[in-house]
Amino acid sequence: MRFLSSLIILLIITIYSSVNGDIYMHSPPGSNNRNQEQGQNRDNNQRLFNSQNNDKGGYCRGEALEWYEKSYLPVEWTNQHGCGSGETECNIVIQYMCTDNAKAADTEYIRDGTVTTTISANDITQSSTKETNEYKFGMHESYHHYQNCTGRERNKGLFIANQNIGNNADRTRQSNNGNNYGYECQEERDYYPYWAPSPWKDVAIITDNRDLCKWYRSESQNVQPKYYCKAATTNNNQPRSIDPVICANQGGVWTKVDSHDIGAPECIKAEWTQVNTLGHVLEDGHNPMYNWSLPHSGMEPCIATGTCSCVLRVRYNISSSDLKGNGDEFTDYKSNGPKGATNVNDPNVVVAGQNVTLNINPNQYGRTFQDRSHVFSIIARPDSLKKAKIWNLLVKGKRGNIVQSHPAQEYQFVPKTLHIKVNEYIHYQWTGCDFNPQNYDGTGIKGSDRSNMCQIKTLNHNYPMTDDELNDDNALFADMETRLRFARLGQKSCLTYDELMTKNNNNKDAVEVDPQNCMVLNNAGTRFNGGVQKMSKTGSYYYMSTRNNNFSNRNQKGAIHVDPLLAGWQIGLIASGCSLFVIISATAGCVTFARFHPHSGMHRAVSKVPGLKRLV
């Protein structure tokens, strides 16, 4: 049965919450369960989801971003335990989900919330104040999804090591206490692909073993319907089975949930990343990254009406060759007996006739980490951009020096280096927040994130190009008004430096944090939307943030390379092909004429050419 085959899954499970672990999403900014708390650590690791990450990670919530449908969004992250290096078996699963603000019930509406407390059934409809409809408590998965999970029998064919786990799907090796993390289903979180219905839609699977790609793609709910046991009303207190036969015997109805019908996800080979480092890929020294082509209104109807609330999730799954999780050597609950190192804490093993102790916890043979974005919107394209190819350019990072910001990162543009074709478009947009720790290093009002963009000659320059140096041939932004908007972020009510000094009694420290000091962007909002700009000239353009680029301390620069539609070698190849075509056509014409005019001068000329004589 196809249902049973879907239970043969990878082990991507379990880690204690005390482990520093981890995957952190940097673009778009990953929350790691933060909201707008100002402490160094997040307030609540159970606010929306079970990340299993360090409490210090994550970016606080700024104003929500919105991107155009079918535009390209750079998804960047760092993962601590490596991938693609042969030292772990790993995959990274990128997923999203959206709800329609105009149609979703309170129990389904995706939102960030304004507090850090975990939602409960009594909190779903609460707003922050009587004056606003903004929800007080954050929520990603719906209450209905959570109810289905807590009322569903867990898959008892799974390896659980030496743990005694309850009967329901809200308990796994990795989370065995029944705590709720928002309305996330812990079993669905820990396993992929999952056998029960899920609201998450697959974007991509990035794996060290591409032999599994066909299976991943075919089992995705993007293309594969899922089933669950809809219980009779008299059976609500009994966990509903995941087996159709037992479901029927319980008086339930084996119920189909259609696929998302959006096409199978992409499955690609993981790039090499170092174990024990939140570092970069080997090939180009940048963070691991996936260019996500955002869904269109045919996939998410709320895009057409401008009423989408969406969230992005990236999960990082690692396991070991010591414990197989798929294929003929699939390890299931039968390995939970007393024998074997995979079921013993810190086992002693014999090496050269003597015991040595391994530093092993069997619960850590398979581990899942996770991060999620704050809520964002996907919007319809205007008529002028219907056929345009649009690349999104963001800012990642948070206030602080390299030590203070870690495991988040210092400010940087994303992508740092962008290659596009002439006449393609860039959507410049980024956000930050005002709730970083007050003592973190940075310019301007304490705790605040701000970034601007000014053109520089090369990446080795730290002074912006002057108006005299910019012209129609070399300017990233052709007109002065656009350059000013990207440099000053549209600030109003600004004071000159002399006015600021007078206002603050010549106290330079007070001038730096004065709200009317627009030179350090103090009067700008947390979000900047520079709009969509057409790149109509080829060339290379370099830029920096004047507020955050602090030479020898931190670097916030970027490069845009606008390439011709065809590379030089392609143009040469086409030219050569055209020349060859002309020569062949001319030769064929001469041969044809000579064949039908045997007494002509053309016939005599062609007959003297080796290889052509026999043709006439």
UniProtKB/Swiss-Prot annotation:
Name of the protein in question:
Protein DD3-3
Compositionally biased, Polar residues: which spans? Answer: 29-55
| Traits of the deletion mutant | Displays down-regulation of regA, cAMP-dependent phosphodiesterase, and overexpression of protein tyrosine kinase during early development and its shutdown during late development.
Q: Which gene encodes it?
A: DD3-3
Entry's localization field: Membrane
Question: Which stretches are Extracellular in the membrane topology?
Answer: 22-563
Please give the function described in this protein's UniProt entry: May participate in O-glycosylation.
Query: According to its UniProt record, where is this protein mainly located?
Result: membrane
